[in-house]
């Protein structure tokens, strides 16, 4: 198995009292993902090392976001290109954020992405992945 650890957040007030499980089984990983509720349990991270991991966040109303990095610099977001250009609000990592509706996938899709990454460390090729764009904006005064 490619994944070496599982981090599952569990927010109690403003404190994360989640778990870190070394050498998790697929059953432990699947259970942690299924427990995401968008309230107290908002993020699961599957790590191979400090720079390579897959994160699944959200869970409320059956909406999840999934992203992967292999170098902690470039990130791939799982997307559903059939969805409209709209914004959904999700709690991820204990905070509410605005996410493109295209980034919000269902549980089965999130589990498929996690299962492939867990087993092989690769992106599931039957799904759509999009490289995250840099969020840095330069002022014309600084150029």
Locate the predicted segments by residue:
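Broad, structure-driven detector of short, well-ordered beta-strand segments within folded domains
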Residues: 51-61, 77
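Acidic, proline/glycine-rich low-complexity IDRs
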Residues: 1-35, 63-143
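Glycine-centered tight beta-turn/hairpin loop motif at sheet-sheet or coil-to-beta transitions
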Residues: 49-51, 72
């Amino acid at each position: 198995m490619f994944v070496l650890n599982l981090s599952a957040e569990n927010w109690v007030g403003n404190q994360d009292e989640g778990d870190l499980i070394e050498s998790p089984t697929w059953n432990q990983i699947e259970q942690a993902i299924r427990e995401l509720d968008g309230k107290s349990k908002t993020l699961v991270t599957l790590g191979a090392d400090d720079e390579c991991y897959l994160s699944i966040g959200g869970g409320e109303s059956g909406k999840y976001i999934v992203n992967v990095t292999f170098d902690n610099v470039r990130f791939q977001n799982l997307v559903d290109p059939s969805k409209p250009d709209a914004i959904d609000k999700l709690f991820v990592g204990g905070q509410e954020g605005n996410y493109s509706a295209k980034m919000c996938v269902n549980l089965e899709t999130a589990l498929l992405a996690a299962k492939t990454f867990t087993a092989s460390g690769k992106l599931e090729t039957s799904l759509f992945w999009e490289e995250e764009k840099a969020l840095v904006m330069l002022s014309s005064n600084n150029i």
